[in-house]
């Protein structure tokens, strides 16, 4: 457990966040498939390290623990490893996270995949083969990682791949990020309407392609929350003005609703989070976060701390993340004095009361619950349970907080006997 005293924010502190987990995980799959890629500033997140380890080992059974991205990307990756049978498994929670839409798409492409326990869920037994089918239909409202998983192997297929997305597209920005990465490596792709086409990669050049991974905008979101509540300047390194990360939307969102201006220093790839003096907060925040659901927890906590009514939609995918994030938010926001209503894809504030005494935030084995609630320490002392969950995406989070806060962050040892 981490106890965060009621704190103040220091001004003009600079933080270096490691590479984007989303980009790093995509690059690791491409590096393994095409080999002529060198990655700089790779994410130091647990998810990325688990994926890297899985790709480097030649074992029949691969356990990726809580790493949902690795589960999805490796399902497609092992599907094209001709002559190799792989059992892909994970943690208890991973076995509760649906993967049927991706498996069905791969089965329709001719891959033999077997559910070893419950229909539609890991663990999976995958028999790799050469894929000759060229088209597949996929529901558009599923996790973008399912679609990305198919896109990452598409350039390796002899005839490429056409993916027809049926229905309304969810998290489009993450799909576009994947296509941008493919294009940078010379894999031709197009996204017109609801159809994505990826051509087979034929330019097997011998020269090494270097890719510098931009820092992680999802991780940056917590510092936007600190800046919004503490009204002090924070600098973050290795961020690009023209980012392909969907969560870079945090810059516009926090400027509009919380008066945090993002100033880019392009030569240094540094951004400054600058609070606007005399900013008038909105009467209510109404926002569709369909394209950036991973930063919704951060925004809800910021709004709750400032007692700004909010209504956030487009959050259907949060139900099947590391935990049911909407239910987790509903439970933990009550401790901050914020009553909410949730549906399958929305969360709405109903009433603001005073925060509870002795606040202890459950994380539900979800890294984003720990980090999104941490900025509330600028309002009131609180404790974050199971603080080590941050290792999934941001192992240095607590150390970086100590650089920007005027307070003590202490570890509480819990006797579990």
Task: For the regions a language model picked out, list residue spans one by one.
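Short, structured segments at the rim of ligand-binding sites
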Residues: 1-417
């Amino acid at each position: 457990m981490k106890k965060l005293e009621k704190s103040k924010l220091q001004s003009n502190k600079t933080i270096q966040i490691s590479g984007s987990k989303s980009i790093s995980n995509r690059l690791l799959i491409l590096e393994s498939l095409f080999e002529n890629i060198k990655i700089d500033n790779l994410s130091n997140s647990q998810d990325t390290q688990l994926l890297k380890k899985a790709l480097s080992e030649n074992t029949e059974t691969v356990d990726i623990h809580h790493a949902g991205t690795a589960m999805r990307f490796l399902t497609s990756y092992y599907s094209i490893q001709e002559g190799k049978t792989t059992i892909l498994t994970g943690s208890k929670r991973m076995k509760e996270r649906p993967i049927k839409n991706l498996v069905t798409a791969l089965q329709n492409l001719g891959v033999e995949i077997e559910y070893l326990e419950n229909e539609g869920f890991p663990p999976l037994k995958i028999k790799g083969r050469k894929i000759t089918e060229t088209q597949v239909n996929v529901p558009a409202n599923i996790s973008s990682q399912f679609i990305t998983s198919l896109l990452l192997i598409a350039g390796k297929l002899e005839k490429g791949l056409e993916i027809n997305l049926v229905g309304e597209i969810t998290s489009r920005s993450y799909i576009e990020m994947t296509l941008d990465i493919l294009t940078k490596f010379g894999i031709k792709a197009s996204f017109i309407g609801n159809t994505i086409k990826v051509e087979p990669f034929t330019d097997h050049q011998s020269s090494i392609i270097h890719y510098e991974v931009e820092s992680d905008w999802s991780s940056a979101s917590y510092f936007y929350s600190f800046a919004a509540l503490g009204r002090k300047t924070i600098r973050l390194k290795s961020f690009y003005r023209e980012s392909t990360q969907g969560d870079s939307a945090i810059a516009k969102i926090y400027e509009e609703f919380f008066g945090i201006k993002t100033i880019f220093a392009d030569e240094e790839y540094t951004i400054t989070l600058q609070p606007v003096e005399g900013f008038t907060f909105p009467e209510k925040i109404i926002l569709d976060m369909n394209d950036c659901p991973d930063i919704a927890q951060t925004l809800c906590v910021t709004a709750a701390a400032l007692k700004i009514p909010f209504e956030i939609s487009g959050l259907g995918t949060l139900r099947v993340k590391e935990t049911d994030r909407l239910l987790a938010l509903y439970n933990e926001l009550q401790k901050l004095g914020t009553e909410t209503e949730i549906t399958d894809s929305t969360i709405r504030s109903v009433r603001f009361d005073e925060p509870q005494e002795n606040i202890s935030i459950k994380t539900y084995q979800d890294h984003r619950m720990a980090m999104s609630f941490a900025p509330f320490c600028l309002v009131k002392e609180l404790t974050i349970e199971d603080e080590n969950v941050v290792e999934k995406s941001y192992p240095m989070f607590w150390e970086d907080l100590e650089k920007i806060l005027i307070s003590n962050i202490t570890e509480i040892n819990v006797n579990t006997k």
